[in-house]
Amino acid sequence: MTVKEYLGQARFLNLFLDVKLAQIKELKSQAEKSAIILNDDRGKADTLERFKQLEEKIQGEMNRLLDLKMEIIDTISRVDDDECRLILEKRFLNGQKYCEIAEDMYMSEKSVYRIQDKAFKKIVEIKNKMTVDGME
């Protein structure tokens, strides 16, 4: 996986997390409806247990996504160049377009690309160091 692909995951994590939260909300609503509709206690308990298992599975997926997002944020925060770090945060954490970043930072898009390439090299160094140090 390239650095751009790795960091690019952060842009979609919020969308995935929103989907998971909506799934849990819908699941809880269905569980409440099922509890009201089901008459026998055994059937109700089995159904509610299944809903609980499904909710736990979705929570596990959310935790995995949050862990990945925290890892990406931590990796970006380790970049020692403020300008590089700011561009990575704006692009991959805030989802800004290159032209927006260039305008915000009073530079050309070409400069944004150049600094981003420099930042990618720093990320590779950080990831390599993390692997060598056994942090990953």
What does each model-found stretch correspond to?
Residues M1-R78, E125-E136:
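N-terminal interaction/assembly modules
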Residues E5-G8, D67, D82, Q96, ...:
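Short, well-structured alpha-helical interface segments that form or flank functional binding sites
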Residues V79-N94:
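Short amphipathic alpha helix immediately N-terminal
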Residues E100-E103:
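Short alpha-helical "recognition helix" segments of helix-turn-helix
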Residues V112-I126:
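DNA major-groove recognition helices of helix-turn-helix
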